[in-house]
Each structure stands twice: as structure tokens, then as C-alpha cells.
Amino acid sequence: MSLIPRIFGDRRSSSMFDPFSIDVFDPFRELGFPGTNSGETSAFANTRIDWKETPEAHVFKADLPGLKLEEVKVEVEEDRVLQISGERNMEKEDKNDKWQRVERSSGKFMRRFRLPENAKMDQVKASMENGVLTVTVPKEEMKKPDVKSIEISG
């Protein structure tokens, strides 16, 4: 097995006996049973969120493609807890439709973050643009210690 990507594509077969196969074997996939993919909602339920600290604020970014503003909720709780949650509903099914493959995830997600003491919980701001949620939590300015010069006698 090579760790270097192949230049002319992957010649590996999609065999159920190949542990490194790209397409995982699912015996029910071709039979048309809905919801056989156990990870159907896991991709959405395990929404990844980046947390970056700048000198001025704590900034959280979450990729939430396809979600509308009203499907996302940002809340602050006591004890400096920031909660980001949302829900993507399944597409309504027409009884005449036959799904060939369902790869887009649906379901709920919720992530909670305990913020440090310097977080200004009353000034949290959130915005969503092009499917990316950005939550900004300003930080209190660090009080600089008073420095007193001492005269050196000689």
C-alpha cells in the first residue's frame, strides 16, 4: 500500500474483501431499504466547529451547508456556556419517488463550549453567510499590572 496518491487514478477495486476499498460494502444498499446507512445522520450530528482565540475575542466557525438561519440556534447559558444547535429535516418523500442513494445527512446537532473567565457573555454576536456560522465572543481586556520603578541607590 502506497502512502503517495496515484497520479492516474485509483486502480483499486471496490471489493468487499478489500479493507482499503473506497466504497464500503452494504448488503442492503441495492435492495432499496431506506435508512440502512447507520451513519445517515452521524455526519450532521457530529458537526465540526473551529474555535479560534484572537487578542480581542473567541471566534467559533461551523460549516452548516444547506441550513437556513431559522434552523440554527445560538444560546448562552449561566456558567459561561455557549450552545450552538440546529436541525436539518429530511426532504419530504413523494410515494412515486424511488431513492437511488441518500448521502446528504439530516437530523439534529448540538455543541456546547465552556468559555474562559475573560469572555464577555453579554456581547456575543452571531452571523451566517454562505452556510458558515460565525459566533464571536469578545474578551475582557486584561488588566495590566501596575509597574512601579524603584530608584537604585548607590
From Swiss-Prot:
Q: Does the keyword Cytoplasm apply?
A: yes
Name recorded for this polypeptide: 17.7 kDa class I heat shock protein
- Name its cellular compartments: Cytoplasm
Its source organism is Solanum peruvianum (Peruvian tomato)
Give the record's keywords alphabetically: Cytoplasm, Stress response
Q: What induces it?
A: By heat stress.
Q: What is the lineage of its organism?
A: Eukaryota, Viridiplantae, Streptophyta, Embryophyta, Tracheophyta
The record, for PANTHER family, names: HEAT-SHOCK PROTEIN 20 FAMILY MEMBER
Per the record's keyword annotation, is Repeat included, yes or no?
no
